[in-house]
Design a protein with these regions (language model features):
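Catalytic beta-strand/loop cores that center a nucleophilic Ser/Cys/Thr
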Residues: 136-174
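RNA-binding accessory domains that recognize and position tRNA/RNA substrates
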Residues: 1-62, 74, 86
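Hydrophobic residues at beta-strand termini and immediately following loops
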Residues: 28, 50, 118, 162, ...
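Cysteine-nucleophile active-site neighborhood
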Residues: 66, 70-150
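Beta-strand-turn-beta hairpins that frame and shape the catalytic cleft
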Residues: 20-25, 134-137, 174
Length: 174
């Protein structure tokens, strides 16, 4: 379905709009929060939301400029097994794929990493995360009880962000 509702007030839209380019973002819905969709719309994106059991043909018909793997509940390993065919096809499209929460963990699993349940999940605001490339601390809001296992991370994935609370992986890139 197409999502068009933005947040009520956008402070400085000219910062985000580049020559009126309106990127088409395919959101794969694993339990996405509406506020995330609102922010994508406010960033001048054309947002189409697809269920996790969608076909790659449906996504291709939308002709996205990028894929967004949403947040959502549950064990990422179980979700990856259920969505393995779709995830594999998404990475063959050769367009940017971004994931948060379970979406981030699914990216790791898709490239061979493992996930495990955290002894203490990250819940709420004010989680300090180190941006490794900028060597800066960022304050984040989190809600996850699983993590990508660092020891299983394949060479094709690089850690970009780590938690300053427990050194867990908070960001990766391919």
């Amino acid at each position: 379905y197409r999502y068009t509702e933005g947040v009520h007030e956008l402070i400085s839209p000219e910062v985000y709009n580049s020559k009126n380019f309106k990127p088409k973002i395919a959101v794969i819905d694993f339990g996405v929060k509406q506020n995330i969709l609102r922010h994508l719309v406010n960033l001048n994106a054309e947002v189409n939301v697809f269920p996790e059991n969608t076909s790659i043909e449906d996504i291709n018909n939308f002709k996205p400029d990028g894929i967004f793997l949403s947040n959502g509940p549950g064990d990422p390993s179980a979700t990856e097994i259920k969505c393995r065919k779709l995830l594999s096809a998404l990475f063959q499209l050769k367009i940017p794929v971004f994931g948060i929460c379970i979406g981030h963990q699914l990216i790791g699993l898709s490239f061979g990493a493992k996930t495990n349940k955290m002894s203490q999940g990250h819940r709420g605001a004010n989680h300090h995360v180190k941006n490794i490339f900028k060597n800066k601390v960022e304050i984040t809001s989190q809600n996850h009880g699983y993590q990508i296992d660092l020891d299983s991370l394949p060479n094709c994935l690089e850690v970009t962000h780590t938690s300053l609370f427990d050194n867990s992986i908070e960001g990766i890139r391919h």
